[in-house]
């Protein structure tokens, strides 16, 4: 619910939600509840070796978690915790990958917009093909109704993870820039 931007300007001074987030992050590190890896290999190893109890990340991390067969059935996809004392805080956020844009340098913006609208922003069938073949998960909400998105995952103990992810995506609050 909160934003580091207000009216197109960075809003860091006096941003109570940001301050509370940083304080909570520091507390989690100081109390050794959370580990902040700066090395990608160590980060992934923490999930694959079972030393991480959880991870707050985008859905694209799933393939890294699934790289360790012995972790099957030990993971599930859930919404994230929220800061109780921050107005507008939710259990949902976006971690990249859900935006499409047309450059101002585009020679045919109408064609580009139409392409995005009818493919990534308008075709459940496209995502039904992309999900099993490329692992591309949609934030296009109607995709959650498809048969492919409702299939369960043995790795995630029978959870319909893709349906849940699209459902969560529909609850991510907008951010004002």
Model-derived segments and their meaning:
Residues 8-37, 80:
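Glycine-centered hinge/linker elements that transmit conformational signals in sensory
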Residues 154-177:
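C-terminal capping/gating helix-and-loop segments adjacent to ligand/active sites or protein-protein/ligand interfaces
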Residues 35-49:
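Short helix-initiation/N-cap motifs at beta->coil->alpha
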Residues 49-58, 73:
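Alpha-to-beta junction loops
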Residues 18-25, 43, 61, 108-112, ...:
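Stable alpha-helical elements in mature extracytoplasmic
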Residues 28-31, 68-135:
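Extracytoplasmic/periplasmic substrate-recognition and gating elements
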Residues 1-7, 22, 88-103, 163:
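Periplasmic solute-binding protein
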């Amino acid at each position: 619910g909160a934003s580091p931007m207000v009216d197109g300007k960075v809003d860091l001074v006096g941003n109570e939600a940001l301050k509370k987030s940083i304080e909570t992050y520091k507390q989690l590190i100081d109390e050794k509840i959370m580990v902040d890896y700066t090395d990608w290999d160590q980060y992934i190893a923490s999930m694959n070796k079972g030393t991480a109890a959880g991870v707050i990340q985008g859905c694209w991390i799933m393939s890294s978690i699934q790289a360790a067969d012995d972790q099957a059935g030990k993971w599930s996809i859930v919404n994230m915790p929220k800061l109780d004392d921050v107005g507008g805080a939710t259990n949902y956020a976006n971690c990249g990958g859900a935006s499409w844009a047309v450059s101002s340098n585009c020679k045919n913006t109408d064609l580009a917009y139409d392409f995005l609208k009818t493919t990534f922003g308008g075709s459940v069938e496209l995502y039904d093909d992309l999900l099993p073949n490329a692992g591309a998960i949609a934030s296009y909400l109607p995709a959650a109704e498809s048969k492919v998105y409702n299939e369960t995952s043995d790795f995630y103990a029978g959870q319909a993870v893709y349906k849940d992810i699209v459902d969560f995506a529909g609850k991510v609050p907008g951010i004002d820039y």
